[in-house]
Amino acid sequence: MAKGKYAANILKQTRKDARWKDTYYGRRVLGLNVKADPLGGAPQGRGIVLEKVGVEAKQPNSAIRKCVRIQLIKNGRQVTAFCPGDGAVNFIDEHDEVTVERIGGRMGGAMGDIPGVRFKVIAVNNVSLNQLVIGRLEKPRR
């Protein structure tokens, strides 16, 4: 390491070079996390329901988690989204427009015992899914 009177530039450049050894720094600066994200860095996204799917829970749990396969409007990518709530999947039909957000797993991954599912449905045809489940609102007829 340089210690002289005019060493500042060398020290600065060394720090700059060393930062690239950090994986998270490199991914952030090059925008790779946003590029790989189906929502493109946005907090929520809209999509069209392609089909309803049942995802089997991981061990030691035994259940079929009700999910929907959707195609995002903004970029055409297909993702699987979990439908939270008792009987929530019954309010969602094919070709409905749903709003999804991240499910909240660590490092942007899946949550709990639902493998490979990183999103959850929060609204169907611009009506809150939670309100539909508790019976406070009705789904609008198209």
UniProtKB/Swiss-Prot annotation:
InterPro entries with a match to the protein in the record: NA-bd_OB-fold, Ribosomal_uS12, Ribosomal_uS12_arc, Ribosomal_uS12_euk/arc
Cellular component GO terms, alphabetical: small ribosomal subunit
A matching Pfam family: Ribosom_S12_S23
This protein's UniProt keywords: Ribonucleoprotein, Ribosomal protein, RNA-binding, rRNA-binding
GO MF assignments: rRNA binding; structural constituent of ribosome
CDD domains per UniProt: Ribosomal_S23
GO biological process: translation
Transmembrane regions: none
Family per record: Belongs to the universal ribosomal protein uS12 family.
Subunit text: Part of the 30S ribosomal subunit.
Described function: With S4 and S5 plays an important role in translational accuracy. Located at the interface of the 30S and 50S subunits.
Name of the protein: Small ribosomal subunit protein uS12
Organism (species): Methanosarcina mazei (strain ATCC BAA-159 / DSM 3647 / Goe1 / Go1 / JCM 11833 / OCM 88) (Methanosarcina frisia)
